[in-house]
């Protein structure tokens, strides 16, 4: 990555590099081809991340997050409609996703999160604060964890796919 030091120094987001990595299939490596991914295994992902990290640790982190969190979660748990809307463009690198778990007073302890999701008709209203969100400023969708049933403990935590242009 000939520009890595400059990007770090100037706090530049590697948008063009990510676009090119997406075109190469590196942003959806373990996603099946039918959903826009490369259909590879996790060893291939690890080796790719290692090579990218040799040139730029920040870019490798973004590639890791995109593959493992938004793509991985939607691939495993998403409906076909969610995969069509989100997984395909995420895997092709046309969109970026971010992962919203960490909170100011609970850290990354998922069982202690306080962000709530309250039902409002057919929708949910999310209330809470998240931080340390890799690619959050540049993402088009967020994977957000929130408590939907406080009495159920860990089983009362749900995961939401939220377009980042959603007001609030």
Language-model region placement:
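A short core secondary-structure module
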Residues: 123, 127-168
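Flexible, small-/acidic-enriched active-site or ligand-binding loops
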Residues: 112-114, 167-168
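Short secondary-structure junction/hinge motifs that connect adjacent elements
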Residues: 3-24
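Internal helix-loop-helix
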Residues: 23-94, 134-141
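A short, Trp-centered hydrophobic/proline-enriched beta-strand micro-motif
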Residues: 93-101
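Hydrophobic, small-residue-rich alpha-helical packing segments that form membrane-like cores
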Residues: 108-109, 124
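Buried hydrophobic positions in well-ordered alpha/beta secondary-structure cores of metabolic enzymes
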Residues: 21, 25, 32, 48, ...
């Amino acid at each position: 990555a000939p520009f890595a030091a400059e990007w770090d120094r100037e706090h530049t987001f590697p948008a063009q590099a990510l676009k090119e990595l997406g075109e190469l299939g590196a942003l959806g490596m373990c996603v099946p081809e039918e959903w826009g991914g490369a259909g590879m295994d996790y060893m291939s992902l690890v080796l790719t991340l290692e090579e990218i990290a040799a040139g730029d640790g920040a870019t490798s982190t973004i590639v890791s997050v995109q593959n493992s969190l938004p793509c991985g979660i939607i691939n495993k748990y998403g409906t076909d409609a969610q995969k069509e809307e989100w997984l395909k463009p995420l895997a092709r690198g046309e969109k970026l996703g971010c992962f919203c778990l960490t909170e100011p007073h609970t850290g990354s302890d998922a069982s202690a999160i306080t962000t709530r999701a309250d039902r409002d008709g057919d929708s949910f209203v999310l209330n809470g604060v998240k931080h340390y969100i890799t690619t959050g400023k540049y993402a088009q969708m967020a994977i957000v964890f929130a408590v939907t049933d406080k009495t159920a403990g860990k089983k009362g935590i749900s995961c939401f796919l939220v377009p980042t242009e959603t007001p609030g």
